[in-house]
């Protein structure tokens, strides 16, 4: 099969996991996009806002690895459906926030519900796409995180400004229901023939990883012994941490430091997300075509993140944000398409969820 020619089943799977991961980010980032308005309405300080952002990641860190393990044990279809229901329910409850503790608790719960999503989706991609298709598939899949930034910043600040922040959360909570129905009918394990083909395509090192092991302890030991996976976890800790630090704080930074409105900051972040949306599938497709190793290409694009961030931080003219913002979006997100493709490539076929959960724990 040509690496850029996907079957109908592959397209449906990719669309389903793309929308699932997209909505996990829309719900995650809905807080950041309305934070300037919500903080003022509930008299939260900037420090309290930071703690609410951190609450999500505390919950996320608790379930990202167990969620991957669960996806390998009970199937990624079940973990995806459960996460969609949980995220929708918690986001709806966020419209009832009245104080700091309630906000912290709900943000924590949202993180718990979001933890299994990425590992489950990557596991599905690993099952349905061959090694020469995964760069493109993962690049397209990871573009949803950038589109999530664009989407939430297009509507949430506007809805919060004109109809109240509570309405913004309720509107966000409705979105996963349609995707839940789609995933219920489309997300399935591939046929035994396809699964046998994927096993045969796995690299020798990955094929040996954990074969015959049923113990969780032994499976984790095998993952930890894989140098590629350890390096990806360390790289992800620094690169992904910086990416989401920038994304979570950019709206508030522009409002408080540069004096723009919440709607204006949302427009800048929409352009930021759109640029990243284009960059990720592009670099993923190129990684499948160019005679360059994915790890070398990943190192190059990670290096470019630094200058892009310095350029954005040096921007004092609000109009220039529409130029430096997209540049930062490209620099901040391009690496994720490559690193996640490398995760799928490095993992044993039956441990893809666990491996993705382990790497994304960092």
Regions inferred by a protein language model and the residue ranges of each:
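Conserved MFS/SLC helix-loop-helix module at the cytosolic interface between two early adjacent transmembrane helices
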Residues: 62-101
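Extracytoplasmic gate region of multi-pass secondary transporters
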Residues: 31-32, 226-270, 277-280
């Amino acid at each position: 099969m040509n690496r850029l020619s996907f079957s109908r089943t592959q397209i449906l799977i990719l669309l389903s996991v793309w929308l699932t991961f997209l909505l996990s980010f829309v719900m995650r980032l809905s807080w950041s996009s309305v934070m300037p308005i919500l903080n003022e309405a509930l008299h939260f300080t900037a420090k309290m806002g930071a703690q609410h952002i951190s609450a999500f990641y505390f919950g996320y860190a608790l379930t990202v690895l167990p969620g991957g393990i669960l996806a390998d044990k009970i199937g990624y279809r079940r973990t995806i459906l459960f996460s969609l229901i949980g995220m929708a329910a918690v986001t709806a409850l966020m419209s009832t926030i009245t104080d700091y503790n309630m906000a912290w608790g709900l943000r924590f719960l949202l993180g718990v519900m979001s933890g299994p999503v990425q590992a489950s989706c990557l596991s599905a991609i690993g099952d349905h796409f061959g090694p020469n298709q995964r760069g493109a598939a993962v690049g397209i899949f990871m573009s949803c995180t950038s589109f999530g930034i664009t989407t939430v910043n297009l509507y949430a600040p506007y809805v919060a400004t004109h109809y109240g922040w509570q309405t913004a959360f309720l509107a966000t909570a409705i979105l996963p229901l349609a995707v839940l129905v789609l995933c219920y009918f489309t997300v399935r394990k591939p046929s035994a023939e396809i699964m046998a083909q994927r096993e045969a395509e796995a690299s020798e090192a990955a094929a040996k990883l954990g074969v015959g092991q049923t113990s969780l302890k032994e499976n984790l030991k095998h993952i930890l012994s894989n140098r590629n996976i350890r390096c990806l976890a360390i790289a992800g800790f620094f690169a992904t941490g910086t990416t989401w630090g920038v994304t979570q704080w950019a709206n508030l930074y522009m409002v408080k430091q540069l004096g723009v409105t919440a709607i204006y900051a949302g427009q800048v972040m929409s352009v930021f997300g759109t640029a990243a949306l284009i960059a990720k599938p592009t670099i993923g497709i190129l990684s499948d075509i160019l005679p360059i190793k994915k790890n070398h290409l990943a190192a190059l694009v990670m290096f470019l993140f630094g200058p892009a961030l310095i350029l954005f931080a040096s921007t004092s003219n609000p109009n220039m944000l529409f130029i430096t913002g997209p540049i930062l979006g490209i620099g901040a997100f391009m690496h994720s398409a490559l690193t996640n493709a490398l995760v799928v490539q490095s993992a044993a076929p039956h441990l893809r969820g666990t491996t993705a959960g382990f790497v994304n724990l960092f």
